[in-house]
Amino acid sequence: MKSFITRPYVYAVTFSVALTLLLVWSLLAVFVIPRELEQPEDEFGTIDFSQFTEQITDAATDEPIYILTLPSEDGDTPEEPSDTGTETDTEAVTEPPAVYPIITENSYLDEHISIVIETLRRYGSDFHVAEIKLDSPQFLKTALAKDTYGLNIKEKTSAQARRVGAILAVNGDYYGANEKGYVIRGGVIYRQSLRPTDDKRRKYFEDLAILWDGSLVPFDEKTTSISDLRSMGAMQVFGFGPTLIKDGEIVVDEGTEVGIANPSGNPRTAIAQLGKNHYLLVVADGRTDQSKGPTLLELATVLRELGAVTAYNLDGGGSATMYFNGKLVNNPCTNWNEIHEREVSDIVYIGY
């Protein structure tokens, strides 16, 4: 009788332990253990940009590289210089300096790239705004952690930026935390599986493509195939979201949030376009006494005030990081209370 009772008990304990170990292994495999993945070997492996060769020169900007003044805290934007000045005045504004690059604590200028960074105070949060003007979209780039594509392969934004020689960088979409969803970097198609629409951890939003001509184009994976993206000439594709601004209009509301994130505000990272080869990279601090972090609607509102016609939300929270000229610009907040830089899968950067 004793043996009869003990045997089922042992079986139950053994089964429970095995099930627990299997569950732990599954969680580690998905969220912790780094796994390098191979690029798909099919006709979609790399986008062929030769079809755009004759148009590439049209993507360049003929205008001199200079930066518009960002709005002050009260939202007013100083007037742009008029065309009524003397010839000497005009030359003083547009003629390039003799020695490049010119670097200050919050700016960078050379023959092809101009960057100015300002910190704006809005909605109880600090917005670190980098305004970028390029003479070619080729200087808007991405990089992968440890120069490797895979799951849970991570490296700090600053470490990735230093490795690739970035002038300015922010974290990307943290593609490596997910097993599905489009991933295109530098014209290479690393992943072409569709993101699930029923993910309980994160809501389904549009992706963002950066095309060969530097245009930011939001799109839906369900209605846009990899073949479509190849025809469009997609250089980069990010899968986080949501789209904040489309065609100059804010497309989020007070109830829009990323999965289970705090609806009252979070650290944020966003990319926006103001015009041809004219961009914003924005990181907003959050989860601190100094800066609560904006809602998605507040983030979109600030970007619209700055003139964005297209804007997209990248990975935020503890990942939200901005790097410029060898230093961190913002205060990354990990685990809700630690000012500490998190390791991430990828970055968006300006550089050569």
Locate the predicted segments by residue.
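Active-site-adjacent helix-turn-beta-strand microarchitecture at beta-sheet edges
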Residues: 79, 98, 104, 108, ...
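Conserved hydrophobic/aromatic beta-strand scaffold that supports enzyme active sites
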Residues: 127-131, 207, 243, 270, ...
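Short, solvent-exposed aromatic-acidic interface loops
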Residues: 144-150, 223-226, 284-288
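Zymogen propeptides
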Residues: 2-201, 207
